[in-house]
Amino acid sequence: MEGKTLIVSVLIMSLFMAQNQVDANICCPSIQARTFYNACLFAVGSPSSCIRNSSCLDISESTCPRGYTNDILENTGDAVTEYCKLGCVSSVCGALTILQNSDASEIVNGEVEKCTMACSTVCTKGSMNAVENA
């Protein structure tokens, strides 16, 4: 059971870190494309394959071209609000929810609750102000 808790905790932490890592060379046309790229990179580990499948661009400049405004550094309040509207819980906690449906153990239920609370914390007004001021 402790092994499952560790795996689930690492999965949650990795999903959040993948969305917050500094990677200014990848520009994506939407938040959905950015999320897909990050998930692909985490699962597959091949940046070129993930770029090709997500419609993102790998650029050498520090500014994304027109139409590709969702670079990783664009974590302003508007981007956080849009991410929260699209469903932080469904995108970040989706794998845990599937696991919960197949194995409704106390540990999995607790991890789903922690993931949901993490999304709630990120999506509150106070957290958005902190991101805007950072």
From Swiss-Prot:
Q: Which GO terms describe its cellular component?
A: extracellular region; nucleus
Q: Which UniProt keywords apply?
A: Disulfide bond, Plant defense, Secreted, Signal, Toxin
**What are the boundaries of the signal sequence?**
1-24
**Gene3D superfamilies attached to this UniProt entry:** Thionin-like
**Which SUPFAM superfamilies does the protein's record reference?**
Crambin-like
Q: Name one GO biological process term.
A: defense response
Q: Which ranges of residues are annotated as propeptide in this record?
A: 71-134
Q: From the UniProt record, which GO molecular function terms apply?
A: toxin activity
One Pfam annotation reads: Thionin
Disulfide bond residue pairs: 27-64, 28-56, 40-50
Q: Which domain of life is it from?
A: Eukaryota
Q: Where in the cell is it found?
A: Secreted
Query: What family does the Swiss-Prot or TrEMBL record give for this protein?
Result: Belongs to the plant thionin (TC 1.C.44) family.
State what this protein does. Thionins are small plant proteins which are toxic to animal cells. They seem to exert their toxic effect at the level of the cell membrane. Their precise function is not known.
Cross-referenced PANTHER family: THIONIN-2.1-RELATED
User: What's the name of the protein?
Assistant: Probable thionin-2.4
